[in-house]
Design a protein with these regions (language model features):
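Intrinsically disordered, low-complexity proline/glycine-rich segments
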Residues: 2-94
Length: 94
């Protein structure tokens, strides 16, 4: 089972996720992260790899999921700033 990724959770590059795709579903009082949510460095859209859980017709992001490069690429770590942290007690099985 994998942790659910949320707004403000860390990315592997040190940025945080900016949950923008859906704002009415919360996990531990934080908006849930869904496919294509960017990070605080600009860009870095997440590529949700959860196959079975959707929010507003978008796949939910879990830890770790890959992402597009953010605005600081080609600096190491910024060309795939994966989801790196998540809820301490909400998990999704694949």
């Amino acid at each position: 089972m994998q942790k659910v990724h949320r707004h403000g959770d860390k990315r592997s590059c040190g940025a945080t996720t900016e949950a923008q795709g859906y704002s009415n579903v919360f996990v531990n009082n934080q908006p849930i992260s869904v496919d294509r949510d960017p990070n605080s460095h600009g860009g870095g859209a997440l590529n949700a790899q959860c196959r079975n859980v959707f929010v507003g017709n978008k796949l939910v992001v879990v830890v770790p999921n890959d992402s597009d490069a953010d605005a600081l690429c080609p600096i190491p770590g910024h060309c795939n700033p994966k989801s790196d942290s998540g809820s301490p007690d909400v998990y999704i099985g694949q």
